[in-house]
Amino acid sequence: MALLRGVFVVAAKRTPFGAYGGLLKDFTATDLSEFAAKAALSAGKVSPETVDSVIMGNVLQSSSDAIYLARHVGLRVGIPKETPALTINRLCGSGFQSIVNGCQEICVKEAEVVLCGGTESMSQAPYCVRTVRFGTKLGSDIKLEDSLWVSLTDQHVQLPIAMTAENLAVKHKISREECDKYALQSQQRWKAANDAGYFNDEMAPIEVKTKKGKQTMQVDEHARPQTTLEQLQKLPPVFKKDGTVTAGNASGIADGAGAVIIASEDAVKKHNFTPLARIVGYFVSGCDPSIMGIGPVPAISGALKKAGLSLKDMDLVEVNEAFAPQYLAVERSLDLDISKTNVNGGAIALGHPLGGSGSRITAHLVHELRRRGGKYAVGSACIGGGQGIAVIIQSTA
């Protein structure tokens, strides 16, 4: 076994994902985490008093209280004030990283039960004004900086993140048509799964205010199931003339959160938890920042090697859909079986709230693996700046 101790998922929940400026825009990332965490504690019958550690992933600290995020989540859901909390940032891998950190704490016996999670309110990313703190001269041309937009450029390689996907399209000879067809597949798979109720077990509904009054939100808002290939083909490339990346085949800017509670084998027995899955192993890898989207390839390969498993052993595979050409490059590099990869759609359909996607993918794999009667699954994400992360789980059903 890749881990030093048995570590089990005893609850896994996520909020519905809201569209940019949509139904969740007035909730902070902390609020969204609170919803997911409360749902996970309830679903797993986990008393807040039994939680030894809180670890939350978050990328854009977009609210005024964001620096306290993990701590406030723990306190809000009733976890004792003596229990420590940690907010982490491994960009798009932050939700996965919270689980990695939690496993590490359990393996070295610093904790027995850990509330992990990831969250993002991209809608609340502020505009900022730099250089004014210490005074400005008369006539200064003060610029507003969009903190969300500028963060989507890797300044080290001077490339918008989407251009790293364009680089992969060139390298792997991926066409615009292939990207649009894949985007359509993501939307269609999401619709089929949503219509069949496959997301129900992972979903933590939220009460939201609308023009019609308060309503319960329990469906991802960003998805566009009515999308057609013809509509996708009409969209202009955004970052490169004759490029492949469009608004229709890239992941959606979104708001949302997930929570995954993990526990040691000893804690499962002591508290009579119902284990949903075992954490088999994980791996984090670096890669060339100019093709950062290829990160899941070394990450998945490394995780499988550590666990003594192969892709053929996996019943489900999830690769976060940052961009269609990025996903397709990973698919080709690993020779993925499309019948068991991103089976219910991905971030192109339902959105990618940066810190929240790893938790969403993990929660989905936990429940989907059980629903299908499968054994192993691997979830992964590329990471801005040139990294990849992967986590392997085994169903206990």
UniProtKB/Swiss-Prot annotation:
Catalytic residues as annotated in Swiss-Prot or TrEMBL: 92 (acyl-thioester intermediate), 382 (proton donor/acceptor)
Binding residues annotated for CoA, in chain numbering: 224, 227, 251
Modified-residue entries (N6-succinyllysine), positions: 25, 45, 137, 143, 171, 191, 209, 211-212, 214, 234, 240, 305, 312
Pathway membership: Lipid metabolism; fatty acid beta-oxidation
Location of the protein in the cell: Mitochondrion
Reactions performed catalytically: an acyl-CoA + acetyl-CoA = a 3-oxoacyl-CoA + CoA; 2 acetyl-CoA = acetoacetyl-CoA + CoA; acetyl-CoA + H2O = acetate + CoA + H(+); propanoyl-CoA + H2O = propanoate + CoA + H(+)
Domain of life the protein comes from: Eukaryota
Organelle transit peptide residues: 1-16
Enzyme Commission number(s) from the entry: 2.3.1.16, 2.3.1.9, 3.1.2.-, 3.1.2.1
Single GO biological process annotation from the record: negative regulation of mitochondrial outer membrane permeabilization involved in apoptotic signaling pathway
Any one GO molecular function term: fatty acyl-CoA hydrolase activity
Residues where N6-acetyllysine is found: 25, 137, 143, 171, 191, 209, 234, 241, 269-270, 305, 312, 340, 375
Modified residues (Phosphotyrosine): 127
UniProt cross-references to InterPro entries, sorted A to Z: Thiolase, Thiolase-like, Thiolase_acyl_enz_int_AS, Thiolase_AS, Thiolase_C, Thiolase_CS, Thiolase_N
Site entry (Increases nucleophilicity of active site Cys), positions: 352
Principal cellular location given in the protein's record: mitochondrion
Pfam families xrefs: Thiolase_C, Thiolase_N
GO cellular component assignments: mitochondrion
Entry-annotated residues carrying Phosphoserine: 121, 140, 310, 333
UniProt cross-references to Gene3D superfamilies, sorted A to Z: 3.40.47.10
Residue(s) carrying Phosphothreonine: 119, 136
Function of the protein: In the production of energy from fats, this is one of the enzymes that catalyzes the last step of the mitochondrial beta-oxidation pathway, an aerobic process breaking down fatty acids into acetyl-CoA. Using free coenzyme A/CoA, catalyzes the thiolytic cleavage of medium- to long-chain unbranched 3-oxoacyl-CoAs into acetyl-CoA and a fatty acyl-CoA shortened by two carbon atoms. Also catalyzes the condensation of two acetyl-CoA molecules into acetoacetyl-CoA and could be involved in the production of ketone bodies. Also displays hydrolase activity on various fatty acyl-CoAs.
Entry-linked PANTHER family: 3-KETOACYL-COA THIOLASE, MITOCHONDRIAL, ACETYL-COA C-ACYLTRANSFERASE
Subunit structure, as described in the record: Homotetramer. Interacts with BNIP3.
Protein name, entry field: 3-ketoacyl-CoA thiolase, mitochondrial
